[in-house]
Regions:
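Structural preference for solvent-exposed beta-strand-turn elements
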Residues: 1-212
């Protein structure tokens, strides 16, 4: 015989969701999560940074669902077009939920529906549902740290840039030893110098646009 708890003790969330469901592009939403979750903070003393901040932004008359995450050292942001934006209120999606949802989006086919309540969010995908509490806290005004009047832009091949950084960074096993980028008009010098394991250097083609 097994001792069991009363079924009435099991929490139910279905009655809490009164807002209309919002249909999301599953592939684009997965990309949004993957692009932002890398910057989620692990510092539990600032719990409001332990997730992805989802909110509505507007550009050229179009509404976007924008996700932002930061650990105060780096910041990641990604957006996708959204309808029924008036049904969505800003919230912080917890780290664990972000990773669980990413797995669901990878493994299950079907239409992705999102619905929110006062302090919870629900995702429906195929025959699966994921309901999560959201983080109770205020996400910092990240727009204050994003440059708006920068006259400099650097264009590189993303594939070549990532490969170069991975090769050069492999020289050092110490995370505290950063990769140095030296920027010129037609190239970028990628280098790392380690007191214990040596140094690495690579040069990749680039185009620097600058008024100065």
């Amino acid at each position: 015989n097994l001792l069991c708890l009363p079924t009435d003790n099991f929490p139910t969330f279905a009655d809490e969701f009164e807002n209309r469901e919002i249909t999301l592009n599953k592939v684009r939403f997965l990309k949004l999560l993957n692009k932002t979750r890398i910057s989620i903070s692990n510092d539990d003393t600032r719990h409001y940074l332990n997730g992805v901040f989802l909110h509505i932004t507007e550009a050229n008359g179009q509404n976007f669902l924008t996700g932002v995450a930061t650990d105060s050292h780096r910041l990641s942001s990604s957006s996708l077009e959204i309808n029924n934006a008036e049904e969505f209120k800003s919230l912080i999606l917890p780290r664990k939920t972000v990773f669980q949802l990413s797995t669901l989006l990878t493994e299950i086919q079907g239409e992705l529906l999102m619905q929110t309540s006062e302090n919870k969010i629900k995702f429906s995908l195929g025959n699966a549902k994921l309901i999560s509490k959201v983080i109770d806290g205020k996400f910092p005004d990240y727009k204050k740290v994003v440059p708006t009047s920068n006259d400099k832009s650097l264009v590189v091949s993303s594939k070549e840039f990532i490969s170069s950084i991975e090769r050069v960074a492999s020289v050092s096993l110490d995370r505290k030893e950063g990769v140095k980028l030296s920027i010129a008009k037609d190239h970028v010098q990628v280098s790392v110098k380690s007191a214990n394991s040596g140094e690495g250097n690579e040069k990749i083609n680039a185009k620097l646009n600058s008024e100065n």
